[in-house]
Amino acid sequence: MQVLPPSSTGGPSRLFIMRPVATTLLMVAILLAGIIGYRALPVSALPEVDYPTIQVVTLYPGASPDVMTSAVTAPLERQFGQMSGLKQMSSQSSGGASVITLQFQLTLPLDVAEQEVQAAINAATNLLPSDLPNPPVYSKVNPADPPIMTLAVTSTAMPMTQVEDMVETRVAQKISQISGVGLVTLSGGQRPAVRVKLNAQAIAALGLTSESVRTAITGANVNSAKGSLDGPSRAVTLSANDQMQSAEEYRQLIIAYQNGAPIRLGDVATVEQGAENSWLGAWANKEQAIVMNVQRQPGANIISTADSIRQMLPQLTESLPKSVKVTVLSDRTTNIRASVDDTQFELMMAIALVVMIIYLFLRNIPATIIPGVAVPLSLIGTFAVMVFLDFSINNLTLMALTIATGFVVDDAIVVIENISRYIEKGEKPLAAALKGAGEIGFTIISLTFSLIAVLIPLLFMGDIVGRLFREFAITLAVAILISAVVSLTLTPMMCARMLSQESLRKQNRFSRASEKMFDRIIAAYGRGLAKVLNHPWLTLSVALSTLLLSVLLWVFIPKGFFPVQDNGIIQGTLQAPQSSSFANMAQRQRQVADVILQDPAVQSLTSFVGVDGTNPSLNSARLQINLKPLDERDDRVQKVIARLQTAVDKVPGVDLFLQPTQDLTIDTQVSRTQYQFTLQATSLDALSTWVPQLMEKLQQLPQLSDVSSDWQDKGLVAYVNVDRDSASRLGISMADVDNALYNAFGQRLISTIYTQANQYRVVLEHNTENTPGLAALDTIRLTSSDGGVVPLSSIAKIEQRFAPLSINHLDQFPVTTISFNVPDNYSLGDAVQAIMDTEKTLNLPVDITTQFQGSTLAFQSALGSTVWLIVAAVVAMYIVLGILYESFIHPITILSTLPTAGVGALLALMIAGSELDVIAIIGIILLIGIVKKNAIMMIDFALAAEREQGMSPREAIYQACLLRFRPILMTTLAALLGALPLMLSTGVGAELRRPLGIGMVGGLIVSQVLTLFTTPVIYLLFDRLALWTKSRFARHEEEA
C-alpha cells in the first residue's frame, strides 16, 4: 500500500506558480539587491565586537615605579574609577611611565567613553606633579591588540634623530588622521634633543651645582609673550633673541662668573645634539630603525583602515629624502584577505558539491538546474539584508553561508522531489506543481521555523562571545528564510515550466544504473526497517545508549575557547635578569635576533628595548616576528614557535616568550603568553609572599607551559638615606636632594626649544662615563644655606636594596599576572582545572583574590553557559514544533534524533584531535536543527497517511520512511557536503573553520545511519503511550 498525498490547490505557492513573469522579476530583484549589497559590504576577519577601550599614558622621566604609582597613577585611577560604564581598569607603573587601560561595557559608545576620560584627566590635573613634561595622553586603542601594520624607517646617510623627526612630523601625524587609526607609536625613541652632560668634578671645582646650572639654562631659554607698541599710526610687535636653537648656542651660554671671568656651559659640560631618551632603541631585522606601529580604534574596520594607509604611503614617502627608506614589515590585512578568500572558495566548492549531489539523486538536468538556481539566489540575497544590518564579509558570516548551502538546498529538494513524484504518476506539470507545493508547504514552514528556533539562543549569548556569533546566527537565519521563500515561489514555478514526464523519464546509462542502485538501497532499508520495528525495545536501548554516550563524551572531551589561528605574526617578549641595563639588554636582543632570523620560516623581525609606556622595564624587550606566507613555509605557527624557543634557549641569560597573534583580542594587557591568571591583594607585601609559592607549584604542572609572572621585585635600588638633622643644620631640604639627583641621573627635561614645526627638549644629566655605577653618587654636590658646596656623601648614606621594577594595579588594587600556555597534549579546560586545584591546596588568605583574565575568563563564561545554550535551543525547538503540530508528543519524537548528532560530532572531534571549543559548539547547535529534518519529513507524511488514508501507525510510518528515504538521504548528503570543505580546509584561517566542519560531518554521518531506524520506533512507542493515556482518561471519565 502506498501513501497518497492530500489534495491541494497550491496553498501559498499558487499565486507564484500562476504568475511566472512576476515571480521571475521578483527573484531578479532579490539577485540584484544581493549583488549590490555584496559590493557595499566591508571585509574583516571577524565581526567587530571590540570592547570600547582607551589607554592613558603619562611619562615622567626619571621617576621610580613607586613615585609613578603614588604621584601619577593613583590620582588618575581615583578619577577614572568614578566613571559610569567602566568594566575594568588596569594600570602599570614603571620607571618613568604610567599606563592605564580602561575597558568599558560593550553597550557604551567609544565617543562617550572618550568624553568621560577627558573629563577625568582634567579633574586630576591639579593632583599630578607640577613638573610633568607633558599632561596625560589618551588614545582610543586596546594595547593588547596587535598593530594592523608595522613599518620600519631606516637611513644609511642620516642619524636616527633626524629620521624620527621627519617621520613624526611628516608621516606619523598624517597616518594618525586616517579614519579608524587609534594610535601610531614610534618605537626607537630617537627624538632630537640637546643633551647637556655635566662634568661633576668641573662644576665642583668651580663651586657650582647641577641645580645652579639648571636654573641658568632655563632662565636663558624662554619663549613667552612680550607685548606690542601701539603708536598713533603704527603698531609694532615686540620680539627678542630669547630662544636658543642649537647645541652650539647652549655651549656658549654663560652660567656664572668667577673672579670676573665668565664660565660657559661648554666649560663644565659636554653639549651635543642627541636623542631625548638614550635608553630606547628599535631594530628592523639587524638594522637600527624607527619602527612605526599602527593600531586601530576598537570597532574600526581593519581592511578599510589599512587600505587608506597604503593609499597615503606613496605620497608621504615622497616628502622624505631619498636616503630614507620606508618598508612595510607586516600587514595583518594580507592574511585576513587570504583567509576570507579561502572561505569564499570553500563556499563556492560547497555550492558545487551540493549541486553535484542533487544531480546524482535526481539524474535529470532540468531538475538539477532548479535547486542550482535556488541555492545561489538564497545566498546572494542574504548580502542585501547584511548591508542593512551593518554586517561585514568575514570568516564567520562566510562560514554561515557555507553551512547554509546544505540548509537552503533542502527546501528546494523537498519541493522538487514531491512535485516530481506526481509528474511521474502522469499528472500535468502545472497540476503536479500546485498539488506538490501545496502538500509540502507546511513541511517547509515547519523545517524553516524549527531551524531558526535553534539559532535564537545564539542571539541571547552574553558578552563578547554573544556579540561575535550574532552575525553568524542572523546571517544563517536570513539565508534560511530567503530559501524558504524561494522554495515556495520560484522552485514550484520552475518545476511547472521545466519538468515533464518526458524529461523525468529520459534516462541514460548512468541514470538507469543509479536508479537500480537506489532501488536496491531502498529495498535493503525497507527490510532492515521491518526487522527494527519488530524489536522496538532493542532499538530504544540503542537510542538511550547514544544519549548516555553523548553525556560521557561531553564530560571527557578536551575543551577550549577559540581555535589558535595562524595569522603569520608572532608577538614575543624577551626577559633578562632584573638588574640588566639598557646596553646589556640591547646586546642580548641582538643575539636573539640573529638566532630568530636564521629560521627558514621567518621573513622579518622588529624588536624594541627601553621603557616608554609600551615596554614595562629595561630588562625586557618586545619582538614582532613576521613569518613567510603559509604557502612558502613548511610548518604552521605553533611548530615555528616551538622551534624558535628551542633555538633561543641556547642564548644564555634570557627567556623568550612567544604567542601567535589572533584576530580576536579580549585581553587589555600585553601578555607574554596566551592565557592569564591574576592574584590581587590589598598590599604588595601579600603578593610578594604568595606569588612565588604559587609560581613554584604552577611551573610543576604538566598541563601548563611557559609559566611566567610579571612580578619583578628584585630590581636594584640605590637607597639614599639622608640624615635629616645634618641636612637641616646646613639648610638643605629634601627637595634640594631630589633635585640634585634628578638633575644628575633622570635625563631631566629642563627646557623646551620651539620651532615652527615641532618642539624639542633640553636634557640635563651627569656625564657618568668615568664614574659608573654607585660611584657616581659621590660626585653629587648640594648648596648649603650659606652658599657653600656640600657633598651628598656628608649628609647621606647609600644602601643597595631591592624593589619592584613595575607596580601593577587592577581596579586600583595591587595585582600580579601569571601568564601561561597550554601544551599540545592538553586543553585549556585541563589547564584551568589544574590551576584551580593548585590554588585550593595553597589556602590563600582572604585578602588575596584570584581571577582568570582575557580569553581564559571568556572561556570560563562560555563553558558555563554552553549546556544552558543547548538546552535553550532544544526547548525553543520543542515550543515551535509543539505549536506547529498542536501536539506535546510529536515534538519529542522529532527531538529524539538529537543525541545521535551529539555522539557523532563529539566522536569526530576526538578522532580529529580537536577540542570542543566555541566554534565546535556552534556546529553541534546547528546539527540540532539539521538532524530533526529527517524526523519531520517522516512524521509529516505518516500523520497525513493516518489522517487521510486510515492507515495504522505502523504501516503509515513504514511507508513514510520508504517514501521519504531518498529526499532524507539527499538533504543529509547536501548538508554534509556543504560542511565538507570546512572540514578539509588547509588555507589561511583554516583553524577557525575546521572544528565546525568536523563536528557537522561527524554528526550528520552518525545521525543519518541511526535516525532512519530509531525515529520510526520512537514514533510508534509514543503513539502507544498516547493511546494508553487516552484510555486511562476515558476510564476515569466513565468511573466519574
Curated annotation (Swiss-Prot):
- Compartments it resides in: Cell inner membrane
Subunit description: Part of a tripartite efflux system composed of MdtA, MdtB and MdtC. MdtB forms a heteromultimer with MdtC.
Protein's UniProt name: Multidrug resistance protein MdtB
Ubl conjugation: present as a keyword of the record?
A: no
Which residues span the membrane? Answer: 16-36, 347-367, 369-389, 396-416, 440-460, 472-492, 537-557, 863-883, 888-908, 911-931, 968-988, 998-1018
Annotated Gene Ontology MF terms? xenobiotic transmembrane transporter activity
S-S pairs: none
Kindly give the InterPro entries that the UniProt entry links to this protein: AcrB_DN_DC_subdom, Acrflvin-R, Multidrug-R_MdtB
Give the family per the record.
Answer: Belongs to the resistance-nodulation-cell division (RND) (TC 2.A.6) family. MdtB subfamily.
> What's the name of its gene?
mdtB
What are the alphabetically sorted keywords of the record? Cell inner membrane, Cell membrane, Membrane, Transmembrane, Transmembrane helix, Transport
Nucleotidyltransferase among keywords: no
Please give the PANTHER family that the UniProt record associates with this protein: MULTIDRUG RESISTANCE PROTEIN MDTB (PTHR32063:SF21), PTHR32063
The conditions that induce or repress this protein are given as: The mdtABC operon is transcriptionally activated by BaeR.
Regarding the membrane, this protein is recorded as: Multi-pass membrane protein
Q: What does this protein do?
A: The MdtABC tripartite complex confers resistance against novobiocin and deoxycholate.
Q: What NCBIfam families does the record point to? A: PRK10503.1, RND_permease_2
